[in-house]
Curated annotation (Swiss-Prot):
Organism: Mus musculus (Mouse)
Gene: Ndufv2
UniProt-listed Enzyme Commission number(s): 7.1.1.2
Required cofactor names: [2Fe-2S] cluster
Keywords of this entry: 2Fe-2S, Acetylation, Electron transport, Iron, Iron-sulfur, Membrane, Metal-binding, Mitochondrion, Mitochondrion inner membrane, NAD, Oxidoreductase, Phosphoprotein, Respiratory chain, Transit peptide, Translocase, Transport, Ubiquinone
Family annotation (Pfam families): 2Fe-2S_thioredx
Residue stretch of the organelle transit peptide: 1-31
UniProt region (Disordered), positions on chain: 229-248
Protein name as annotated: NADH dehydrogenase [ubiquinone] flavoprotein 2, mitochondrial
Function: Core subunit of the mitochondrial membrane respiratory chain NADH dehydrogenase (Complex I) which catalyzes electron transfer from NADH through the respiratory chain, using ubiquinone as an electron acceptor. Parts of the peripheral arm of the enzyme, where the electrons from NADH are accepted by flavin mononucleotide (FMN) and then passed along a chain of iron-sulfur clusters by electron tunnelling to the final acceptor ubiquinone. Contains one iron-sulfur cluster.
Length: 248
């Protein structure tokens, strides 16, 4: 039988992992991924008649994208063209997916499959600044909870909500691949890393002022270097021919 200490530890771990499982569900729900949410339901803001068309500039970009693939394989361009639609519109209504299918001459279902699989495609409107807080294990161990709590208090919204002025949307996401710089958040295309609650408040203040905060670590270190500085690769690499026998 488990000792009382082991039982308590197991209970604590179960609660912790249960919370993060719920967070994953929240992320999936917000992005329109998972389970029954693969089924589209028309709403006043998201239906086949929702106005959407690419700009002339983006039609030219699509032509350039399609040329990267062999003739007859334009379906390979679904991901980048969906991304282009989202960058133009801010999110992907079903009408945008239909337009992508029309432009690439593929069945609409092929586009729906992609748009519902990747959570990076936003199937509901988001704010001008889409704040994605990583709460996976490495960030959690580096106190990402305090970052999330600070954002909720600062913005006056909960996870999955958008501020009334449509400026900020806040969601939780799974690993963003910057574990060595935990805790971190992604805001639109930029990573902000090595965060403290004070850092994230300053970032929000800059965004509210119309500025673009400098992305990357806030701790002063370069990229993902060790906090104490480099311990290897401390000098420029040797030139061509280094270590090669003179007769070769």
């Amino acid at each position: 039988m488990f000792s009382l200490a082991l039982r308590a530890r197991a209970t604590g771990l179960a609660a912790q992992w249960g919370r993060h499982a719920r967070n994953l569900h929240k992320t999936a729900v917000h992005n329109g991924a998972g389970g029954a949410l693969f089924v589209h339901r028309d709403t006043p803001e998201n239906n086949p008649d929702t106005p959407f068309d690419f700009t002339p500039e983006n039609y030219k970009r699509i032509e350039a994208i399609v040329k990267n693939y062999p003739e007859g394989h334009q379906a390979a361009a679904v991901l980048p063209v969906l991304d282009l639609a989202q960058r133009q519109n801010g999110w992907l209504p079903i009408s945008a997916m239909n337009k992508v299918a029309e432009v690439l001459q593929v069945p609409p279902m092929r586009v729906y499959e992609v748009a519902t699989f990747y959570t990076m495609y936003n199937r509901k409107p988001v704010g001008k600044y889409h704040i994605q807080v990583c709460t996976t294990t490495p960030c959690m161990l580096r106190d990402s909870d305090s970052i999330l709590e600070t954002l909720q208090r600062k913005l006056g919204i909960k996870v999955g909500e958008t501020t009334p002025d449509k400026l900020f949307t806040l969601i939780e996401v799974e690993c963003l691949g910057a574990c060595v710089n935990a805790p971190m958040v992604q805001i639109n295309d930029n990573y902000y890393e090595d965060l403290t609650p004070k850092d994230i408040e300053e970032i929000i203040d800059e965004l509210k002022a119309g500025k673009v905060p400098k992305p990357g670590p806030r701790s002063g270190r370069f990229c993902c270097e060790p906090a104490g500085g480099l311990t290897s690769l401390t000098e420029p690499p040797k030139g061509p021919g280094f270590g090669v026998q003179a007769g070769l």
